[in-house]
Amino acid sequence: MANFKMVSPFKAAGDQVKAIENIAKSFGEGKNKITLVGVTGSGKTFTMAEVITRVKKPTLILSHNKTLAAQLFREFKEFFPENAVEYFVSYYDYYQPEAYVPSSDTFIEKDMSMNEEIDKLRLRATSSLLERDDVIIVSSVSCIYGLGSPEDYMNSVVMLQVGDKIDRDQIIRKFLHIQYARNDIDFSRGNFRVRGDTIEIMPSYQEEGIRIELFGDEIDGLSKIDPLTGKVKIKLDRVVVYPAKHFITSGPKIKDAMEKIKEEMAAQKEYFLKQGKHLEAERIESRTNYDMEMLLELGYCSGIENYSRHLTGRAEGERPACLLDYFPGKDFLLIIDESHVTLPQIGGMYAGDRSRKQTLVEFGFRLPSALDNRPLNFTEFEAMTPRTLYVSATPDQNELNKSEAVFEQIIRPTGLLDPVVEVRPTTNQIEDLLNEIRLRINQKERVLITTLTKKMSEDLTDYYKEVGLKIAYLHSEIDTIERTEIIRDLRKGVYDCIVGINLLREGLDIPEVSLVAILDADKEGFLRNYKSLVQTIGRAARNVNGKAILYADRMTDSIKKAMSETERRRLIQEAHNEKMGITPQTIQKEIHDILPREMAEEDSKEEALKDLEKEFTLKKYKTKDKLREALKREMLRYANDMDFEKAAMFRDKMLALGPDKIET
């Protein structure tokens, strides 16, 4: 059993006590699916940490975006300084997958920019799982994508011990086999250098180098060294060097795979010829032969992942190995944070990936086996994660139906109440809100404003700047590292308020915010539904003066339901405060960078969206109706994933086409 040692100046209080006990007890009784309904500011992260210490299993915490994953990673590093807390997200700063657009006969080559720091953290995560069981990995949905086989990875590990009989050339060959490159000049991660009878290697997953000193054919000394100065940090008796990459394949496997790939290519070529598709037949033959030549000469080729089924010896349709396979015995605890957003995201990955690759296969750009280079589908994911804790302030019916037990965490240890919710008419809403903002500025508090359209956000920001407010507008063209810096500057007082379309950002901790203003709150739709309203109102729940103003001319069902739920939570907290003699206090929290700068964030999403927008043109779709339908499909897809800012961009593009009945 994993031994986790939690360090915190706080003790469980309020609903945390019962929630922790009930969740741990339920898992102990053999229940596998549990939901924690925890309001904003109730200390859900603390509860998660306590549950981990009691369940005593390696843990995977799944978050729906890199920003929140990074925030959780930092918090769990503080909770568990003596345990292995790791970070596993996509290592692409920018990623454009290969694709084919039949309507314009356009083939888009794969283009990407890889983040070396995140690659190192990913490798460190898997090496920790293979070395120890007291491991907590905070991950994005990247954990369901294909990764090298853990068996191949483990079988390729190089273990060295002082006194071992092994010659220098043997060690060099072993390092080359596990994807390290010899470079006697550049001693950086993934490289090794040789100086006489001394070999120094820079593992891809750690900060220190390793020095191997030989005396003839015997290892005379092992030590960790500073890669810059070469100074010895600590002497070692033994070292374990893990591969530089997750995908490791032996020579015999590559030869076997090449035979199978050629057989599949011949069958696919014959299929195309029978269909009268001579261009596709020629294309698949030439592209595959080129890749095979590259693979034979260099050991790799562009898009090698598309041949992963053959290279790993999997059967047709068999799922790929992924991070979940690296957990020992596949016996671990899964915590899905903000489950109402994360679960739909997991479910959508497989379908989106398959749709793109199916087109590549149909037009001869890829073999059918490329379809097996994919993320897990939802059924496979569920089968691999039996012990699951869903965590959300607004869980979806999906996770509630699956759960064998549901526990609430309504009471906040700080005594803070849910924000007061007030509905005001939209008439003169801009001036009314300006007065409210000035009141908050006088109290050194901050404000969040959410609008329905990009144009309204821009106009509102310009107007408030003219009247002297320190205001920032968060929009999709701001990369996420800059976005997190704007949020930090809001906390520091550089800005008085922030305007945006989607300021949900579940889990973001901004205790200085005492007012959330929701403009056009009665425009029922994906930006103003019950869950969106509850989550947005919750942004003011960490401040003792928390208040939400909904500007609306009518009471929608979503507004009524959100106000009713907020009032229910307020009454529960008030009763607890009165019983325990608690005076509510604003959460006091140090101002950190939410995301370390070296951890590049979700630029890839923003860039991908720009590329999508370029794709949706009248020239391509011929008629406004066809373009409108395509835009609507994308809008609804993003809305279903609660990615409202992107959904709103597609909606705005629809509106720009001219009058039509558009559902928001």
From Swiss-Prot:
**Entry-linked InterPro entries:** Helicase/UvrB_N, Helicase_ATP-bd, Helicase_C-like, P-loop_NTPase, UVR_dom, UVR_dom_sf, UvrB, UvrB_inter
Placement of sequence motif Beta-hairpin: 91-114
Which SUPFAM superfamilies has this protein been placed in? C-terminal UvrC-binding domain of UvrB, P-loop containing nucleoside triphosphate hydrolases
Main localization (coarse): cytoplasm
- Every copy of the UVR domain together lies at 625-660
**Its function?**
The UvrABC repair system catalyzes the recognition and processing of DNA lesions. A damage recognition complex composed of 2 UvrA and 2 UvrB subunits scans DNA for abnormalities. Upon binding of the UvrA(2)B(2) complex to a putative damaged site, the DNA wraps around one UvrB monomer. DNA wrap is dependent on ATP binding by UvrB and probably causes local melting of the DNA helix, facilitating insertion of UvrB beta-hairpin between the DNA strands. Then UvrB probes one DNA strand for the presence of a lesion.
**What family does the database annotate?**
Belongs to the UvrB family.
Output the NCBIfam families linked to this UniProt entry.
PRK05298.1, uvrb
Q: How does it assemble?
A: Forms a heterotetramer with UvrA during the search for lesions. Interacts with UvrC in an incision complex.
Q: What name goes with this protein?
A: UvrABC system protein B
